[in-house]
Amino acid sequence: MFLGLPEAAESEGFDRETLDMPAKQIALLEAVAAENKNVVVVLSNGSVVTVAPWAKNAKGILESWLLGQSGGPALADVLFGKVSPSGKLAQTIPFDINDDPSTINWPGEEGHVDYGEGVFVGYRYYDTYNKAVDYPFGFGLSYATFEVSDVKAVKTGACTASVSAVVKNTSNVTPPKPCRCTWLLARPT
């Protein structure tokens, strides 16, 4: 089942007042899920939407964002198992819009919002202030499963490190990218 944001909610030059999906779409999902428990939701949206309020009605959720002209065949390949999904979230999905630090300064004055979060934008805010989130920055699943062992990190310079690990694919699925490493440079804010 495809769900997403209507064109009126996707724009430059104004901010959305909510991260919620349209109520009519949630009602449709609930009606379909009441008849068939094997519902997979494919999201089509240009910005974050909350999924916690309705995720219980879906066996799976695939965020496709706003696909381009070749998006349909690529999405079909993922849905039918020809390729394994490998995308990672480029942002954090909070449980509620009020969990996001940008709401402190919103709606601003006369259409202008003061971006006062400083370096505490996105995951930095949630990590620093130990805020629970629905899906963290970098989250992503695959049809493949892995076993990771012998993880080692060695500082090699002021701002460099060497990281190694043994990653074993424990499934019959070949993923495009088996492993990702993210590190944080500790610095004063």
Which residues are covered by each model-predicted region?
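Secreted, periplasmic, or luminal enzymes acting at the cell surface/secretory milieu
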Residues: 44-176, 180-184
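A cross-domain feature marking catalytic cores of carbohydrate-active enzymes
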Residues: 3, 43
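Alpha-helical scaffolding segments of alpha/beta enzyme cores, especially the outer helices
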Residues: 24-34
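Glycine/threonine-rich flexible loop motifs
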Residues: 5-22
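A short helix->loop->beta-strand "cap" motif at the edges of active sites that frequently abuts
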Residues: 34-39, 58-59
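Redox-cofactor binding/interface segments in oxidoreductases and associated redox assembly factors
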Residues: 1-2, 63
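Active/binding-pocket-proximal capping segment
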Residues: 9, 18, 180-188
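Short, glycine/acidic-rich beta->alpha junctions
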Residues: 20-24, 70-71
